[in-house]
């Protein structure tokens, strides 16, 4: 396998970006009616829901149930469904596994015997109870419910070393229980080192209203980079060199080998004249994707569980950890169409050995054949996501009242191949989670936990994140926050990712660039290379919440901090039953680690530069 050091990476950055979907050798005439077709036909019936009140329909997706619709403030009110959805996720590992593109991997980890686990589905307002059984041979685990706010349930966030001890291997188990206070599309994944890169991921669909009408819900469509080596080995390699390109890209678990033609293209069935909702999820460890469907536009209706006003695009940048719900109007001639992935930003935001990763969107009645039109190259998004989406549920701030507070600076920098936040690479303690400090009233937190204490009830907190302005080389980062959506008040000027033009936030110039009038709101946003990002969230959800880069190698290398929000309120919110479950799980883990574990902890303990500083309001 080829690995690039930083020097080699820089030398290759100006190579042309990958272009468009093209058939792998020897695939012409192959029967492309894959199991995805059947799965998604059933999804068209299962997903979407009816809201209990029967008002949600193809001609009125804005309605949900009596008293609840697209304009309801879901942070203040949630339907009382009286339902609990129960799931069981069993984690296992397999040796010498034949992958989707025919290449044998010496080890994979699975959820319910699949590298993409079952979809967790519920209606807005349901409780969800998930039993996780860890049958891995030597790894602990914890499962994080990405993007779910966990309002008043921080203890269910699923982050080992923060909200819990890991679940021990060889049969250890844990029951997570939380309420679906939001709706839309997300995913779950392991938060134990880089473990999710070995296959421990799965979609989440919370049925609810939508900002535009559609006929068919196609269900979740996860996309991920795919490596023939294990994530564990890749983490160790990235501690000494730049990351390798992915070996392939999976579309809903399917892929074609770029040279042998082994495997299958994922296929999605469209009905002529119908509008289809597709739930896009980037579950990668490193690759960001530019997506386009030949001869079709996409209308965005949701970004990271935040419903937005319909926004039409011809192509879409999907960063690691991000989700978009889009509507595709099947208004073209009956036929087969390439759904293409390309890599922009001079490959600063990902690369693959498969130069033409693609899936097939097939109209009902079309022949089972490869598409013939490769389409045209989409615009290069330069590793930047959309920042002009308008949320349906509005949040606005007066940006003129923002003042910098340099006393709350949180520098995040690259030191060799170690990422440091506030001068420290986060290194959580599996045996003593931060929540244990909170439960016992111990405020002597470890420096390596990178804790920023945040107080004040329902106050807006502002954070300016600057991307390694003093370093010689900088990369874009998908910044993800647990427990909250954040308002994107501004970012540095759009430039090419390769330019490495330095942009340090200058209040005299950049205050005018800020937008507080219902700006884009989400839980994962791109921090430009050598640039800045200014975000805000409200202190309405007590918890210890990670903010981290969602590139697995970077968070594994330390790029993360914790916002400990309203610690005393957090302590008071935890029930005796949850506290007992927490202690029982930690006792089980400590009986295993480190004395009975065959391997030491060799990274931050999470999935495994930049400055962040708090900005306060003037009074």
UniProtKB/Swiss-Prot annotation:
Q: Which GO terms describe its cellular component?
A: extracellular region
- Residue positions binding Cu cation 3: 191, 482, 548
Binding, Cu cation 2: 146, 189, 550
What effect on the protein does mutating residue 17 to P have, as reported in its record?
In strain: Oak Ridge
Give the EC number(s) listed in the UniProt record: 1.10.3.2
Q: Name one GO biological process term.
A: lignin catabolic process
Q: What subcellular compartments does it reside in?
A: Secreted
Q: Which residues bind Cu cation 1?
A: 144, 480
Matching entries from InterPro entries are given as: Cu-oxidase-like_N, Cu-oxidase_2nd, Cu-oxidase_C, Cu-oxidase_fam, Cu_oxidase_CS, Cu_oxidase_Cu_BS, Cupredoxin
Q: What is the effect of changing residue 320 to I?
A: In strain: TS
Span of domain Plastocyanin-like: 84-207, 216-373, 431-566
| Effect on the protein of changing residue 351 to T | In strain: TS
Indicate the secretion signal residues: 1-21
Going by the UniProt record, its keywords in alphabetical order are: Copper, Disulfide bond, Glycoprotein, Lignin degradation, Metal-binding, Oxidoreductase, Repeat, Secreted, Signal
> Pfam families, from UniProt?
Cu-oxidase, Cu-oxidase_2, Cu-oxidase_3
Catalytic activity annotated for this protein? 4 hydroquinone + O2 = 4 benzosemiquinone + 2 H2O
Which Cys-Cys disulphide bridges does the record give?
55-63, 165-586, 349-383
Presence of the UniProt keyword Lipoprotein in the record: no
- Residue stretch(es) of the prosequence: 22-49, 607-619
Glycosylation annotated at which residues? 139, 282, 295, 340, 422, 444
> Which cofactors?
Cu cation
Report the function annotation for this chain.
Lignin degradation and detoxification of lignin-derived products.
Q: Into which family does the record put it? A: Belongs to the multicopper oxidase family.
What protein name does the entry list?
Laccase
The organism of origin for this protein: Neurospora crassa (strain ATCC 24698 / 74-OR23-1A / CBS 708.71 / DSM 1257 / FGSC 987)
